[in-house]
Amino acid sequence: MKHTLRYAPIAAALLLITSCASKKAITDGTQLPTQTSKTDKNAEKEAARQSLQFVQRIANNNVATENILTSGDFTLQLGSKEITVPAKLSMRKDECIRIQLLMPILRSELARIEFTPNYVLLLDRYHKEYIKASYSEVSFLANNGLSFYSLQALFWNQLIAPGAKTITDADMKKFVADGAAGSSRVPGTLKAGNITYKWSVDAATALIKGADITFKSAAHGTSSLTWTYNDFNTVGQKKFPTTQQFGFSTNYGGSNHAAQVTLQMASPKTSTNSDTKTEV
């Protein structure tokens, strides 16, 4: 409100000048279009300033700890089929994201999904099989420009800087946060080539409540990854979402494919008691 009042006299003066210029144009043809353009530029600068300020608030919510360990339930939905098993989530910043799927009651490991900066690992303990591949070899990740650091930002409830480990001050200026609507959610957007990133952010707390990544290509069709966050608990003096749901869909190859995963976690800890890489 203070910013609006600060610019009100300027806007009023420009309106008056523009009005006088219109009358003068009738008599001698003189026009002063620059006055309107100055008003527009002032409005654009103020909108950009408010957008950057809000993006900085989002970044200030980042959990500062290096490790997050938690247990809970993992639910996978493929079409009409749904399965829920106990699970563990272990994350070490810039090194590893690991989801372990456990056998009910016995809690022995059934499968493991692991992301590191260099590879993706899918380990099936039950059938004694595994797939280990680089990000360029996993078509959905490669086609959508998703790297380890993109996935890390999503799991850690943070903004994504495409192709970078962290978001710099210069990167923050590329985001557009539109708080003009005055609603409880502020939409944020970032475009990078064929990929559009969108976030839904709580206006009061600046916590990210949802993220949507869409990739459009003539060669690979349209793919999307949608992430929602709920049930925020305190982790390292910051808020971390203990319920995360992410769904991905693609029509790559002319066929529609979709899946949805829900992670429900309890009491996240910041312990370092976990290996950073799985030996296979």
Residue ranges and their predicted role:
Residues C96-Y149:
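An acidic-aromatic
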Residues A21-K81:
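N-terminal leader/targeting segments and the immediate start of mature chains
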Residues L141-Y149, A153-K173:
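C-terminal low-complexity, charged extensions that often adopt amphipathic alpha-helices
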Residues S22, I26, I167-E279:
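Gly/Pro-enriched, hydrophobic low-complexity segments
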Residues N60-I68, L78-I83, S90-R92, I113, ...:
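Edge/loop elements at the starts and ends of beta-strands within beta-rich repeat scaffolds
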